[in-house]
Amino acid sequence: MAFTSALTKHVPFSSPLLRDAGYIDGVWTSGDATKTFDVLNPATGELLASLPDMGAAETRAAIDAAHAAQPGWAARPARERSAILRKWFDLMVANADELAAILTAEMGKPFPEARGEILYAAAYIEWYAEEAKRIYGETIPAPSDDKRMIVIRQPVGVVGTITPWNFPAAMITRKIAPALAVGCTVVSKPAEQTPLTAIALAVLAEQAGIPAGVFNVIVGVDGPAIGRELCGNEKVRKISFTGSTEVGRILMRQCADQIKKVSLELGGNAPFIVFDDADLDAAVEGAIASKYRNAGQTCVCANRLYVQSNVYDAFAAKLAAKVAEMSVGDGFKPGVVIGPLIDEQGLAKVEDHVSDALAKGAKVLTGGKRIDGAGTFFTPTVLTGVARGMKVAREETFGPVAPLFRFETVEDVIAQANDTEFGLAAYFYAGDLKKVWRVAEALEYGMIGINTGLMSSETAPFGGIKQSGLGREGSRHGADDYLEMKYLCIGGV
């Protein structure tokens, strides 16, 4: 049986959202796969499902299907593409509870948080359903009276998307919605830890009327082989990837020979700064929202918390008191706010970062250890006495650990915050308006949260600078990377 009782106790076995196959050219198929791979619940270690282990051959077939379907999809009036996307959005909202149950089962985040992700993911489809009708060109004043100069924008073509496990719904729709809206077709490779959510989204896309070949899903564990095919196949004209900076570099190199368009949303290591004129209670709430959402497994979560010296102890005490009250456990249990780490590798990294900090002089205010028993759980943690030489200062922890650094001056903390190869997101809490402007302009990051710990929205451009990536997702700018600009010069008029 492809699906086990560990999954069907949360999602009915008869649910149309459960498919044990990839989706190529409008057909649910195992392709030529001779092996399967397992999908596990990280909260319990239980087997949820076994899926076909697809590879380069199936990816090539999906690319061929997308390439054949792309001209017809692009030729459809924007209003038609918009209507289909809107129907997909409606189906996601109508099936939000079932989608959230699938997501919680395979990824582990608490069910209310998973449901929030589903609605957030759907919002990108709704947004780009509207933006599909607003892909405008422009006219240019000609240098002579017998010419007319026009710029039009056309879809780039076939797009390959590679998405991570930490937001298995939102990372997919944030890429696919703008691509489909402007007339591109897509081959999607979800993370092998969380393929069931992607499959469920494809089921609803099919129900919404997205034609065969327009949206394809490849499931499998051989990410390098699938990635090489997507990057090396000349029919694919764009790659969009969310994941580690290390893998992003590899994909960028593989795309270089064909000068393929690339969008990359990579690592973070976000600073979270608390100045002495901040509202400390609000800063604590913002830190919790930013740091502990999804058990700290987000690329934009606060990774380094800098607190000005004269409020350091007060902030640390307030934060530790709140964090100590957090309930950790299976995401399906009521009241749980911190779920598991995605796997043993993720848990081991968190343990290593905490051990390294303690060995170098840091202190634990609360938490600091894994939770014994089934699942990959780590207690929500607050560390004080943290210094630059520790791993928590240089690497993304990707776990529920808040290391508190002490600083004295604005200049000092700006230098520390910018002392990283990354530049995705940063946060700070302050009261003085002049300071707010100066700090926001000085921080070398693509997104800045000011007096808030949450800033992601389908209406805003998401993306980083430095080695945190290229391009933007969301907002009216999010469609740009899926379009080519074409200049038309008409003479003799």
Where do the language-model regions lie?
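A short hydrophobic/small-residue beta-strand
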Residues: 185-187, 364, 447
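Glycine-rich loop-to-alpha-helix module at the N-terminal edge of alpha/beta enzyme cores
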Residues: 46-135, 146
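Residue-level signal for inorganic ion chemistry
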Residues: 45, 66, 81, 103, ...
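Rossmann-like NAD(P) dinucleotide-binding subdomain of oxidoreductase/dehydrogenase enzymes
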Residues: 137-282, 407
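Short, well-ordered beta-strand elements within core beta-sheets of diverse protein domains
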Residues: 48-54, 69-75, 161, 272-275, ...
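Terminal low-complexity tails and localization/encapsulation signals of metabolic enzymes
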Residues: 1-50, 83, 87, 135-162, ...
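Conserved C-terminal structural/oligomerization subdomain of aldehyde/semialdehyde dehydrogenase
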Residues: 44-50, 236, 273, 327-331, ...
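ALDH superfamily catalytic-core signature
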Residues: 246-387, 450, 492
